[in-house]
């Protein structure tokens, strides 16, 4: 089995395929396993994983790697899945770097697909000099005045994570309604984080490093300047499926349409996780785990015709799950 995407759903799928006795390879365009969690949210605390009241992103990925590595999957990192060819009883996936992988089944767990952060409207002149899109290491911002821009989960999560170590945290959003989970919004509102609504960043000042930020109140036009050594632009990401759009998959708003078995409609191609679309779809890491198991189990008879869809329980044979 080839799993395209080494994020949480892909890593759990690799474990589950190994548990089912399959040999597994994971292909990902990123240089490290863990997908968006490793690349963007390693310090973010995740609260909605079953059995884990709170876990940092990097800790979750470390645990998933330990679980998957019981069955020694092959990691093909820095390789973007590009071309698909069908052979008798198999498919061949060629990466953008020319690596060819033959597999009985492919499970796509590519998350957002190819993604790029949305820049601040003021530009990227201070990128790497105080302007960041995500916070891979919290302690870098110890004692700083931090401006977090955005109204979604990432903005509120980072504001909450930075509040205990930063000198000050200000969250600015151009509206007075937020996309973030209500419980997180309430926690930020109860903290020392200052929330400024109907506010945008008008200008970032500083020579070698950010020194101050000019904010504008969009309803009144009033401007004020406050000190800042860091600006976290949590404005979301633009994403597309890249070469996967050439695989004859059914696409709905940058997501791959699947049926209840996680099959895509293209022979021997399944999908799971945030990249999928079906009626009632909820995009959570937690649901991605179940979708990965569903995809692997339904794909199992294509790998081994004698295999059953239902695998039994891991507790029956002592295999960790």
UniProtKB/Swiss-Prot annotation:
Binds 1 FAD per subunit. InterPro entries: FAD/NAD-bd_sf (IPR036188), FAD/NAD-binding_dom (IPR023753), Fd--NADP_Rdtase_type_2 (IPR022890), Ferredoxin-NADP_redctase_2 (IPR050097). One of its GO terms (molecular function) is NADP binding. FAD binds at residues 28, 36, 41, 81, 115, 274, 315. Keywords: FAD, Flavoprotein, NADP, Oxidoreductase. Its EC number is 1.18.1.2. Pfam families: Pyr_redox_2. Its cofactor is FAD. It catalyses: 2 reduced [2Fe-2S]-[ferredoxin] + NADP(+) + H(+) = 2 oxidized [2Fe-2S]-[ferredoxin] + NADPH. Homodimer. This is Ferredoxin--NADP reductase.
């Amino acid at each position: 089995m080839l799993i395209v995407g080494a994020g949480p759903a892909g890593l759990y799928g690799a474990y589950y395929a190994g548990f089912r006795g399959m040999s597994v390879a994971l292909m990902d365009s990123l240089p490290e396993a863990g997908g968006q969690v490793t690349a963007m949210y390693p310090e973010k605390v995740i609260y909605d994983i079953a059995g884990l009241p709170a876990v940092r992103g990097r800790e979750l990925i470390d645990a998933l790697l330990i679980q998957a590595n019981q069955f020694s999957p092959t990691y093909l990192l820095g390789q973007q899945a590009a071309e698909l060819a069908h052979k008798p009883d198999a498919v061949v996936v060629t990466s953008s770097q020319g690596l060819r992988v033959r597999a009985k089944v492919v499970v796509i767990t590519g998350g957002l697909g190819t993604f790029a952060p949305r820049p601040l409207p003021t530009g990227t002149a201070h990128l790497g000099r105080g302007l960041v899109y995500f916070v891979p290491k919290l302690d870098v911002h110890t004692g700083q005045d931090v401006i977090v821009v955005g109204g979604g989960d990432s903005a509120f999560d980072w504001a909450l994570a930075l509040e205990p170590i930063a000198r000050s945290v200000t969250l600015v959003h151009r509206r007075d309604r937020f996309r973030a989970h209500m419980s997180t919004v309430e926690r930020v509102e109860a903290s020392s984080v200052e929330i400024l609504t109907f506010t945008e960043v008008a200008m970032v000042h500083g020579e070698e490093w950010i020194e101050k930020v000019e904010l504008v109140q969009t309803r009144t036009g009033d401007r004020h300047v406050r000190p800042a050594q860091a600006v976290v632009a949590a404005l979301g990401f633009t994403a597309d499926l890249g070469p996967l759009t050439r695989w004859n998959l059914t696409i709905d708003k940058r997501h791959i349409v699947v049926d209840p078995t996680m099959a895509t409609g293209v022979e021997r191609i399944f999908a799971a996780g945030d990249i999928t679309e079906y009626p009632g779809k909820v995009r959570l890491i937690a649901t991605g785990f179940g979708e990965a198991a569903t995809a692997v189990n339904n794909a199992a008879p294509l790998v081994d015709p004698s295999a059953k869809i239902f695998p039994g329980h891991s507790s029956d044979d002592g295999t960790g799950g």
